Every structure is written in C-alpha cells, then in structure tokens.
C-alpha cells in the first residue's frame, strides 16, 4: 500500500510537470520526453483494483424507487391509511431494530431469516422481522390493555427474494391491530372487513380471503396422531399447499420430518377441504374432530365469525380453508390470508391463486411473553402486503401506458417577455403563502414555449403568465394547459381563481 501511495504521488508530480511545460510552451521534444516518463510511471502503477471491483448497486433484495414509482406508492398508502382511520385507528411507531431476545422464539422456522446487527456497545440487536412483535412489546412495556392502532413501516428478512414478484429483503408492511378483551369474533370480523375494503378500493383484481383457526389445526393434528412436538413443523409443511401439490407436502412430512405415512394420509383427508359455513357445520358433526375440545372451540368461533361476515356483506369473499396454517408461532386462534385470483382458462374450473396480498390473525399470548407477570392482552390484526400490490399496480400502468403525475404542482408562474424574473419571484411567493402549489423555471429569461412545454410534460394544469401589458393593467393571464384557453384575472383574485379551478378549498379552517 505504501509503495502504491508513493507511485501515485510521483504520477501526480509528473503530471503537474507536463502541464507546466505545456503552459510555458516548452519544446515539443522536452514535452514528449516528460510525457513518456509519465506514461512509464502510470504503467508501473497499474490499474486500481479496488475501483475496478466495486460495482455501484443496491444490496441484494433492495431497490431504489423513482418519482413515478413513489407516486404510485403514495396513492396506495393513501387508500390504506384512509381505511384504517375510517375504522378509528391511532398511529404508533417503533424502532427499526429491537433487542435480539425480543424477537427470538416468536417466528418458528422463520427465525433464521432475522437480520442480526453488530453493536459497539455490546447489546445483541436485530432488525425487526415484522410489526406485530414490536407492537406486543410496546403494549407490555407501556402496560396497555386496550388500543386500536395502525403502523406503516419497513421490515427486514434475510431470505432469497423474488424481486420480480414483489418480494424483497427490505419492504413495507401496513398493519392494523385491535388489542383488548372483547366479545368473541367482533374485532376479528372487523379486521376481515378492513382487508376486503382495502383490496376492493385498490382495484387490483378479484381476491379470496382464506380463513382457518389454529385451534382447529392443532385439534386435527392431535386426532390424526401427530405428536405435540411436531405440531409446528408439520404446520409449516401444510402451509405450503397453496404453492405445491399434496404429494410434495406429504413427501416432505414423511421423508424429511419423520411422520408416519398413515398419519400424513389422515391429515390429507382434512387439509384438502375448503368451503363456506356449510363446511364448518359439516366438521362440527365430524365424529373425531368434534370430540377434540380445541377444535370444537375453533369451529364454534368460525361459525359465529361467518354470521358477522354475512352482516358485513363480505361472506362471498371468504373461504374456510383447512390447509391455511400461517407459519408464525404466535397465532392462537383465527388466521386468514387474502390471495389474488387469476381468471381460469376454462369456465367451471377452480379460480387459481396468484399470490398472497394480505394476512393476519389472532395472537392472544404474544403480549404475555413480554409481561413480567405473564398478563395476556388478547390481540387480533392484519397486515397488507403492499410490495406485492405495488408490483401489480406498476405492471398494470405500464401495460396501459398510463401517464402518472409525479408532482402536485397546480400552476407554473411564467413570463412572456424578458427581464421579468423579479415579478415572477414576487408572484410565486404570493401563491406559496396562500397555500397554492406553484413552480417557476430557474432561468432569468426563459422562452414562453419552453415554459408551456414544461407544464405539458409535468402535467401542470395552469400557467400564470406575467407580461409588461398585464403588469400595467394589474392582471395576470391564466392559461389552461389542456384547452389552451386564456383569461385575464385581476391579481387580487388570482388565488381564488386557481383554487376554484383546481378544486382546492377556498380557506384553511
């Protein structure tokens, strides 16, 4: 390293000598001789390997977002936040990293995907895996027993994501949760209603919400002959049924997880069933499942849930699916997952799911894990998979070649003649002070045509044009970019006229 630094210094000095000789207009022979020395030194130096090897890119599983992409995101977030607020939720925020012990033991087999951090102070830290566990920690720390909250923030998972399908290592989650002791299934039904409202409002296609109950799963495993120690690992296998065939799931359970083939077959008889409230009624009459206390409680709650979903008018969007397992360890009751459906090729075929876009469930024991006295706070919630939704919306807009505005500018302050920069600056300041979203070009004497073209490219609807005659008459020429219609507006009336044309309230109360 020291030798390289010395050579670099010699190259620098020789380069300065060559430049000096050229400025002094020295003889061509002398300059040529010194240039040869410079080239020889550069050859000795060789290429800078550190610069050659460095590739400018974002880390694996992350990406930058262009103004166009961010405009799409803001619209999606706006739909989600308005829905959360409509249902009476407060907003909170928590640190992006937590103590490692806060996160460990909460995610089952997915714990291996948690990002660990190195901290000079000696604390063992991890990036948050989701927003649910930090929320439970927040409740326990603040001794809260009743809250309805939403939280939109980034989470981190150390897996191998398929970025083309909207899966990343760093991504946003939009969570809504209800904490507190309430009568059964009322908060759960509201969470499902919120999920359906958001997915319908976003207009991303037909969807289906699968529901199940962790107690039904555990009861089913018990009567099929699965040992308690294997409940969670078998659960994670069953959860793959939406992606792979039953045969593949069975092979994993038998070959990799040591389950007896006859036990796997008994599980298969159950987990391949799905339907509505009629399936709940059918299973309540099942001679084996109905004898299991846990399963019976879960089925009873699901029957009640379907009653409330019918009252909310969303029962046609819900399917009771015994294969839904949700791999996270902290779920204790009802679980659900929304999937987008792609239209079947042939009439009469089953709709085909093309990806999960929202999920959630009940987790009554999670807060108690953090409370010193183990006090439980029942919770139920949902999480919207916005990255998947962003990908779908972006693809749709690209296919339609639809133009998206990336700014909210309402008016461009323009000039028709030269030497009117001061007047433009005064006017744009007046508009900003009045709450108008306004811009001007950063040139002293821009051409009017260039100013109008900028408006068309940026989607700015109005142009306020200042000219020498307008200044004498005390008016501003207001031009519609799309219709090209121009009207003279008195300067004192300009703010109200812009607000009227752009649909902005005339006063801020």
Swiss-Prot record:
Molecular function per GO: ATP binding; histidine-tRNA ligase activity; identical protein binding; protein homodimerization activity; RNA binding
Domain WHEP-TRS: from-to ranges: 3-59
Any Gene Ontology CC annotation: cytosol
First-listed, main subcellular location of the protein, grouped into a coarse class: cytoplasm
Sequence positions that bind L-histidine: 130-132, 157, 173, 177, 326, 330-331
N-acetylalanine found at: 2
Keywords: Acetylation, Aminoacyl-tRNA synthetase, ATP-binding, Charcot-Marie-Tooth disease, Cytoplasm, Deafness, Disease variant, Ligase, Neurodegeneration, Neuropathy, Nucleotide-binding, Phosphoprotein, Protein biosynthesis, Retinitis pigmentosa, Usher syndrome
Record annotation: effect of changing residue 155 to G: In CMT2W; uncertain significance; fails to complement deletion of the yeast ortholog; decreases histidine-tRNA ligase activity; increases in the KM for ATP binding; does not disrupt dimerization
Enzyme class: ligase
Residues where Phosphoserine is found: 66, 356
Effect after changing residue 505 to S: In CMT2W; uncertain significance
Cited Gene3D superfamilies: Anticodon-binding domain, Bira Bifunctional Protein, Domain 2, S15/NS1, RNA-binding
Gene Ontology BP terms: histidyl-tRNA aminoacylation; mitochondrial translation; translation; tRNA aminoacylation for protein translation
Catalytic activity of the protein: tRNA(His) + L-histidine + ATP = L-histidyl-tRNA(His) + AMP + diphosphate + H(+)
SUPFAM superfamilies: Class II aaRS ABD-related (SSF52954), Class II aaRS and biotin synthetases (SSF55681), S15/NS1 RNA-binding domain (SSF47060)
Outcome after substituting residue 356 to N: In CMT2W; uncertain significance; fails to complement deletion of the yeast ortholog; decreases histidine-tRNA ligase activity; increases in the KM for ATP binding; does not disrupt dimerization
Outcome following mutation: residue 364 to Y: In CMT2W; loss-of-function variant
Result after altering residue 134 to H: In CMT2W; loss-of-function variant
EC number, UniProt record: 6.1.1.21
Summary of the tissues where the protein is detected: Brain, heart, liver and kidney.
Subunit structure, interactors included: Homodimer.
Role of this protein: Catalyzes the ATP-dependent ligation of histidine to the 3'-end of its cognate tRNA, via the formation of an aminoacyl-adenylate intermediate (His-AMP). Plays a role in axon guidance.
UniProt similarity note: Belongs to the class-II aminoacyl-tRNA synthetase family.
Illness: Usher syndrome 3B: A syndrome characterized by progressive vision and hearing loss during early childhood. Some patients have the so-called 'Charles Bonnet syndrome,' involving decreased visual acuity and vivid visual hallucinations. USH is a genetically heterogeneous condition characterized by the association of retinitis pigmentosa with sensorineural deafness. Age at onset and differences in auditory and vestibular function distinguish Usher syndrome type 1 (USH1), Usher syndrome type 2 (USH2) and Usher syndrome type 3 (USH3). Charcot-Marie-Tooth disease, axonal, type 2W: An autosomal dominant, axonal form of Charcot-Marie-Tooth disease, a disorder of the peripheral nervous system, characterized by progressive weakness and atrophy, initially of the peroneal muscles and later of the distal muscles of the arms. Charcot-Marie-Tooth disease is classified in two main groups on the basis of electrophysiologic properties and histopathology: primary peripheral demyelinating neuropathies (designated CMT1 when they are dominantly inherited) and primary peripheral axonal neuropathies (CMT2).
Protein name: Histidine--tRNA ligase, cytoplasmic
The species this protein was found in: Homo sapiens (Human)
């Amino acid at each position: 390293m020291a030798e390289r630094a010395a050579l670099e210094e010699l190259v620098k000095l020789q380069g300065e000598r060559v430049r000096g000789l050229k400025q002094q207009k020295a003889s061509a022979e002398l300059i040529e001789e010194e240039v040869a020395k410079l080239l020889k030194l550069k050859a000795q130096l060789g290429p800078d390997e550190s610069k050659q090897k460095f590739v400018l890119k974002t880390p694996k599983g992350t990406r930058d977002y262009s103004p166009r992409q961010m405009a799409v995101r803001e619209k999606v977030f706006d739909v989600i936040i308005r829905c959360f607020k409509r249902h009476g939720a407060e907003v909170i925020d928590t640190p992006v990293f937590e103590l490692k012990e806060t996160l460990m033991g909460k995610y089952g087999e997915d714990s291996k995907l948690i990002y660990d951090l190195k901290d000079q102070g000696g604390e063992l830290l991890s990036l948050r895996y989701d927003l649910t566990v930090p929320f439970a920690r927040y409740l326990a720390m603040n001794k809260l027993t009743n809250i309805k909250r939403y939280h939109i923030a980034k989470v981190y998972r150390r897996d191998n994501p398929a970025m083309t399908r909207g899966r990343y290592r760093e991504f946003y989650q939009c969570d809504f949760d209800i904490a507190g002791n309430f009568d059964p299934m009322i908060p759960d039904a509201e969470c499902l209603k919120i999920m359906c409202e958001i997915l319908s409002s976003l207009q991303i296609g037909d969807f289906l919400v699968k529901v199940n109950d962790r107690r039904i799963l555990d009861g089913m495993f018990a009567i099929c002959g699965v040992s308690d120690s294997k409940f969670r690992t078998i659960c994670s296998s069953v959860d793959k049924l939406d992606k792979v065939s039953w045969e593949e799931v069975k092979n994993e359970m038998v070959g990799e997880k040591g389950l007896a083939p006859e036990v796997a077959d008994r599980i298969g008889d159950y987990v391949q069933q799905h339907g509505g409230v009629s399936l709940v009624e059918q299973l309540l009459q099942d001679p084996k499942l109905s004898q299991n206390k846990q399963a019976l409680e879960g089925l009873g709650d699901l029957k009640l849930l379907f009653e409330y979903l019918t009252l909310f008018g969303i029962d046609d969007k819900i399917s009771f699916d015994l294969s839904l397992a949700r791999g996270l360890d902290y779920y204790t009751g009802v679980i659900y997952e929304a999937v987008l459906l792609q239209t079947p090729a042939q009439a009469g075929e089953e709709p085909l799911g093309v990806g999960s876009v929202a999920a959630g469930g009940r987790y009554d024991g999670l807060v108690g894990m953090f409370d010193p006295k183990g006090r439980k706070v029942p919770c139920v919630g949902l999480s919207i998979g916005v990255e998947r939704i962003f990908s779908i919306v972006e693809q749709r807009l690209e296919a339609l070649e639809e133009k998206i505005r990336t700014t909210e500018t309402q008016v461009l302050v323009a000039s028709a003649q030269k030497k009117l920069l001061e007047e433009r600056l005064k006017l744009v300041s007046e508009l900003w002070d009045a709450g108008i979203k306004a811009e001007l070009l950063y040139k002293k004497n821009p051409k009017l045509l260039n100013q109008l073209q900028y408006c068309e490219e940026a989607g700015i609807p109005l142009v306020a044009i200042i000219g020498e005659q307008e200044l004498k008459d005390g008016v501003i020429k207001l031009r519609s970019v799309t219709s090209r219609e121009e009207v003279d507006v008195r300067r004192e009336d300009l703010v109200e006229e812009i607000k009227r044309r752009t649909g902005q309230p005339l006063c801020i109360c």
